[in-house]
Amino acid sequence: MAGNYLTLHTNDRAVVTTSRGNQEKWFDTEKNLWYKADGGCFEALAEAVSSEVLRNFTNAVQLPGISVANYWVDTAEVHGLKRVVSVSENFKREDGSLVTANTILKNSLGTDYLEEFNRRTSLKERIRLLVDAMGEATRMQNMGAYLTTLFEVDALFLNQDRHLNNIALIRDKFGYKPCPIFDCGDSFLLDFALYSPEIESRAYLTKAQCLPFKSRFTQTVHPAQALYGKQLVVNI
C-alpha cells in the first residue's frame, strides 16, 4: 500500500517501521472474516491475485511452515456507500497473538534498534542481523528461509509494503510460528497515482522499492538467497 510511512534513517539508510493507518477494517465474528475498504481502488485486486497465484502457481504452501492468507474481492455498504472491499479469512486462533518484526526487534535490540541496522555497511549484513535477531528472540526454526520467502514473494509481485509491521509471527502456548503470507496490496504497480497506465510498466521497475530496507528487489533477494538458499519456485 503506497502511503505515509514513518521512516527513521541514518546516513540515508532506512528501515520503514509503520504502515499508514487510514484503511478501515472490520471483523465479522460470525463468519470469522476480515473486511478492509479498498481506499486506492487497487489493493483488493492485488491481494486477491497474489493470494491466488501463490496458492496455485508456486510451491509456497509446500515450503516448511509456510501458508498463504486467502483473499478475495467483494462489495459492501460502508457509511451508506457501496465500496469495494478486500476479504480475508482470519488466520489467528483465539489462543494466539500476532507479533510484528517491529515489536520483536524493539524487545530484543532496544528501541534504538535502527541504529544497529545502520551500523552494518552492506545489505547482506543487515539481512543477517534481521534474521539472527528475530531467530534468537523467538527461537523459531528456519527464520532465514521464512524471511527469504517473503522477499522472493515481494519481488515476484513488486510488493512495496513489506515494512516491519507487515512481517509477523504468530505466538501461542507452543511458541512462535510463521504468519501466513499476507498484505500484498501494494503490488503490480497498480497505484495509478504513482504509476500512470499510459507509461510502459518497465519504465517504473527501477523506481520500485523493496521494504523493509528500501532497496531494489534484486538487491534484497540475492543476498538473502546467498545466505539462506532459494525458496520460492513459480510454476506458470
Segments (PLM) and residue ranges:
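Short C-terminal domain-edge/linker segments immediately following a structured domain
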Residues: 64-68, 119-121, 209-215
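Conserved kinase catalytic-core segment
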Residues: 124-193
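C-terminal catalytic region of ATP-dependent kinase domains
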Residues: 174-236
